[in-house]
Amino acid sequence: MTFKNALRVVLWGVGAVLAVCVVGAILLINPGTPSSAKTLEFKGYILLPKGALLSVLDYLNVSEKRLFVTSETTGDVYKVALHDGSLPSDADVSVFASVPAAHGVVIDPQTGFAFVSRSEANTVDIFDPANMQPLKRIPVADDPDGIFYEPFHKLVYVVGCDAKLGTVIDPASRSIVATIPLGGKPEFAAFDSQTNLMYQNLKDTNTLVVVDLEKRAVTRSWKLDKCLGPSGMAIDEANRLLFIVCANNNMLVVFDINKERVQDGFPIGGGPDSVVFDAGLRRIYTTGKAGVLAVFQQDSPDAYHLIDSVKLHYGAHTLAVDFSTHSVYVGYASLVVRPRIAVFQPLP
């Protein structure tokens, strides 16, 4: 290849990268409105305070008419007061500000306190949602991400991705009581109240493991067929099923707990990260980095069909459902403009 040809290739590559960056920036600056949906009504946006030029929201959690939202970029945790029939206003939003890289947030129902994981500081912060003031900072294993409440033993379980560990925290004493080697990089987990066990995705080994918090150990593991890079997980306890989204091959798989195998798989939008199962409506919602909200109807434990695919906004990868109202909340990534949550209500 001549120098001119080599230079032309380099310039073309640089131009292509810049074009992608410009298009991406335009998408983040202009959230627009979601595409039309057959089964959902778009109610509007919950606008959050602008804390940085670029805002990437991570986990969402609905608890007692409050929506908690974390910001991976600023580290802020937002508390949004929810109202039936109307969108929250600016006055309904309060902020717990701290160091960057907030990820998971969970509420301990016994104390009412909130626990939030922070991957840059390698800590779990405890704060009081009543006044949004800090209570304690607990050092944990490297790269804490997902955080979950285990109601049977009344424990908080946080996973460290780089450390490949689960850390168990007693919320009453606000102290670590155990660390559990997981054998891979953990993502989402789901608690099974019938067995009092935690099911845990390992994204680097495409594995599902069972974590027994009483024994402080992994007790079972299975390879996940049809699933590369398992991320989000939701449980259907009544039918003994797990719904798992797979980030590296854009799939939703259904895992049968009793039969110990993947029973089905469905293609979904790019970079899927979150999945929620609304047992009341028998609907499965998934979102991913490509900004597509997929809605599946569970016709029976063995049969599913796609009932909606809604184009949202690039980076809209995280969601939550208020099971009392069936409202669906999706967090958007944003550049320059205020971060926001898209709100949907199922149509009758």
What role is predicted for each listed range?
Residues 5-6, 17, 21-348:
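Predominantly soluble domains enriched in secretory-pathway, periplasmic, or organellar proteins
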Residues 1-10:
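Short, Lys/Arg-rich N-terminal segment immediately upstream of the first membrane anchor
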